[in-house]
């Protein structure tokens, strides 16, 4: 019997699937994994067909599937299994999970078309003969006549433009003089506005614009736009210009009308690769450690059985070449390969590396997938993979769902990185999901890192993972020498507070004289951390979040790095109106400015989310640094990992201990990892490297052991702390947040949930909270937090699922409760 019903996962925030009837016309094309268009309430949604059945649901009226989008199922069977696992493990709505797995769909509009019926045409003739018509009849005549004259259906979105149109249409439909039919339309390719400073504007236009009297704010806005649109950076997308210059679209339009700006539209498209200079392939000579690791991986791939290996290798030990050769082996055996990297920026480098390494052998068989690609390009790459045209995929977290078939090898580079964890629904972990995918595919998963997460290294020690080790750098190059600079002693000696110690400045001066490069890490964006009033002690806060605003000098704005809110810098304190406002702390922007003052002849650039808002800008800066066109690169943590700069002999770490103050049990681990990773950027070429770590807390074990680059000692010490405090890997952990814009709702719901969780203590589950979250207000929502610890994963899952069911019974909105399983951040 032909299945007549289909279970469909829809991208709605509900932990359930929906049943639809399969019409006879689609019976042969609706299969598990198909993307289907279905009616949902008053709109059309794209969903995934999960399974077919001929069992009659217990619902009287079943809506039908409208359309099948693709000639072949979008998701192969193993990916459907993986999606169901993600939804179950992370307690996520199935539809949200499958939406994350699918390529961007050309957006749909569900409209009604109104057609003239036979009786409608007769009624139109009657109305035409009337000398005097009522107001309702006038509206009905206009609507019917429009349909008759145009000779085609009227779209429902045009009714609002006709006087009395919606009401007239309702009457005509009720009387059968119009008929309605649902239509699904595809939206056009997305475009973006590009803005450039018009250097070719006639002189009379420029002088006229200058002579016109303008308010101070208008002149300031124009200067900020001129500053942002420099010749060096070139044209910018409108959205980036508005953010960086802190101006409105109206300001841009005014300057465009004056001829000072040029504005045009172009499709969102992939930008060209600017990583030409400084790009080198790894050496072809493997050392003995690399050969042993590769032989192990080859044996696992040949066995065709699920295996997880942890490749622990010090920075510069040649893990990348092991990855590439392992992929070669998998391809030679007819399997496909997936390489995950933690940052979008690294996909550019690794993708180009793979294309250069495999060259014509794969005939353009390398695909790059990440969320920053324009929808059209991402869909194109995704379907190349699905059709089997690409056999190697490089991507970030979301690429774990790439539709590769016959998968043989999954590589997770820098597996410890928190960016593998999705911070929005569905809150899956890319590394752990990759391991489960490898299990479903009987494939090999290789996790690589110089600073493995405690959980992964613990699993390797316990025998759950196989441990591979690279303990020496390629060509036996020494690790960089690390020196700790005690900023307390520096302050006592110089009475100077700020970044870039005397030792660091002297070391940079030496590198400038020798012609080598310096890399300076400061993990703070902006110019100053916040603005403080010396009169009342208040800091200028975000209107939407319980966080201080960061000062960005280039934009002359105070900015919230959580919600994007910004405001002008106040001349007086908003709280007490004191004029004594003080800019506290030093960020990457200020450090760059000070280094330019200190070394006026040096070629200095900054790389952070403010200067590298597009792929082009990111590539331009890194490409210039790799090619030796820059002397000093200042950056946030995006410069700390994965890059191979042969001429860097000095790495400076400014304010190395700021992350230690965070209220998070992983704070020490993150600090150790960041310092070790950035230290690994020095001395990767033939010249030895030096690392200077500036800190006010030099005795902390994370600082001390990072300076010694002693991962095993750090692992033992941190593991002891985790065991004492019952944190992972010794317990299963979940973070539950209750949120709402009304604080009374958030308080009431969190108390109700606390009442439900209280009895769970008797089942061995430790419940901490509710308490105000560390970020108590975010995007105008008040947030209260629970932390649940359980000795076994199954216990925790049952308790969380029961808690969500309790919320549904108490009519607590699903959107008000966030469940984060295996959280990497407690914010």
What annotation goes with each model-predicted range?
Residues 779-781:
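C-terminal effector/interaction modules appended to NTPase cores
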């Amino acid at each position: 019997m032909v299945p007549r019903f289909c279970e469909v996962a829809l991208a709605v925030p509900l932990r359930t699937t929906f049943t639809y009837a399969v019409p006879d016309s689609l019976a042969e094309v609706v299969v598990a994994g198909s993307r289907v268009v279905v009616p949902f309430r008053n709109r059309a949604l794209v969903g995934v067909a999960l399974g077919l059945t001929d069992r009659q649901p217990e619902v009287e009226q079943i809506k039908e599937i409208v359309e099948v989008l693709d000639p072949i199922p979008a998701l192969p069977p193993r990916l459907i299994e993986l999606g169901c696992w993600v939804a179950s493990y992370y307690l996520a709505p199935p539809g949200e999970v499958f939406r994350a797995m699918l390529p961007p769909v050309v957006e749909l509009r569900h409209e009604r078309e109104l057609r003239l019926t036979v009786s409608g045409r007769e009624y139109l003739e009657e109305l035409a003969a009337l000398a005097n018509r009522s107001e309702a009849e006038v509206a009905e005549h206009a609507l019917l006549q429009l349909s008759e004259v145009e000779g085609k259906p009227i779209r429902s979105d045009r009714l609002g433009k006709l006087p009395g149109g919606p009401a007239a249409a309702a009457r005509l439909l009720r009387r059968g003089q119009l008929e309605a039919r649902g239509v699904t339309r595809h939206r056009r390719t997305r475009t973006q506005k590009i803005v450039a400073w018009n250097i070719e504007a006639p002189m009379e236009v420029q002088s006229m614009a200058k002579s016109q009297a303008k308010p101070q704010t208008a002149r300031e806005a124009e200067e900020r736009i001129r500053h942002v649109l420099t010749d060096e950076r070139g044209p910018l997308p409108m959205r980036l210009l508005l953010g960086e210059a802190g101006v409105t679209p109206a300001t841009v339009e005014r300057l465009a009308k004056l001829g000072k700006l040029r504005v045009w539209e172009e499709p969102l498209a992939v930008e060209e690769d600017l990583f030409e200079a400084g790009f080198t392939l790894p050496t072809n000579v493997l050392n003995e450690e690399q050969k042993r690791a590769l032989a192990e991986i080859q044996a696992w791939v040949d066995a065709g059985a699920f295996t997880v290996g942890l490749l622990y290798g010090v920075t510069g030990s040649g893990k990348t070449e092991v990855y590439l050769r392992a992929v070669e082996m998998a391809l030679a055996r007819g399997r496909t390969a997936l390489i995950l990297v933690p940052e979008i920026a690294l996909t550019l480098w690794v993708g180009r590396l793979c294309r250069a390494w495999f060259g014509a052998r794969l005939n353009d068989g390398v695909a790059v997938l990440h969320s920053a690609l324009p929808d059209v390009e991402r869909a194109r790459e995704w379907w190349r993979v699905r059709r089997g045209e690409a056999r190697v995929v490089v991507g970030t977290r979301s690429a774990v769902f790439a539709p590769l078939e016959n998968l043989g090898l999954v590589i997770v580079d820098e597996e410890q990185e928190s960016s593998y964890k999705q911070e929005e629904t569905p809150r899956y972990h890319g590394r752990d999901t990759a391991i489960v995918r490898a299990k479903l595919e009987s494939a090999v998963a290789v996790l690589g890192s110089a600073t493995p997460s405690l959980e992964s290294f613990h699993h390797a020690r316990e025998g759950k993972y196989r441990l591979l080790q690279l303990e020496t750098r390629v060509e036996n190059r020494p690790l960089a020498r690390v020196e700790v600079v005690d900023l307390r002693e520096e302050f006592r000696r110089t009475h100077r507070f700020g970044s870039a110690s005397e030792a660091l400045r002297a070391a940079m001066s030496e590198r400038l004289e020798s012609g080598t490069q310096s890399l300076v890490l400061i993990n703070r964006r902006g110019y100053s951390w916040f603005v403080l009033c010396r009169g009342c002690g208040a800091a200028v806060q975000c209107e939407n979040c319980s966080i201080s605003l960061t000062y960005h000098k280039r934009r002359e704005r105070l900015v919230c790095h959580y919600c994007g809110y910004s405001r002008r810098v106040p001349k007086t304190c908003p709280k007490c109106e004191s004029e004594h406002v003080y800019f506290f702390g030093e960020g990457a922007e200020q450090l760059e400015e000070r280094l330019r003052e200190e070394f006026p002849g040096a070629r200095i650039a900054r790389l952070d989310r403010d200067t590298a808002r597009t792929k082009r800008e990111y590539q331009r800066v890194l490409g210039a640094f790799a090619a030796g066109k820059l002397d000093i690169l200042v950056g946030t943590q995006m410069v700390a990992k994965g890059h191979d700069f042969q001429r860097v002999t000095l790495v400076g770490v400014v304010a190395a201990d700021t992350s230690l103050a965070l209220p998070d049990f992983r704070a020490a681990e993150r600090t150790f990892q960041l310092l070790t990773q950035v230290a690994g950027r020095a001395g990767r070429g033939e010249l030895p490297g030096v690392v200077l770590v500036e800190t006010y807390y030099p005795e902390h074990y994370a600082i001390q052991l990072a300076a010694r680059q002693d991962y095993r000692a750090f692992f033992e010490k941190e593991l002891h702390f985790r065991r004492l405090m019952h944190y992972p890997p010794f317990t299963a952990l979940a973070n539950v947040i209750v949120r709402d814009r009304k604080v009374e709702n958030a308080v009431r719901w969190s108390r109700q949930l606390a009442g439900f969780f209280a009895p769970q203590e008797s089942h061995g589950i430790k419940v901490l909270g509710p308490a105000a979250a560390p970020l108590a207000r975010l995007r105008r929502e008040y947030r209260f937090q629970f932390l649940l610890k359980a000795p076994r994963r199954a216990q925790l899952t049952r308790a969380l699922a029961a808690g969500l069911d309790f919320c549904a019974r108490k009519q607590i909105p699903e959107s008000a409760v966030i469940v984060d399983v295996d959280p990497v951040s407690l914010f």
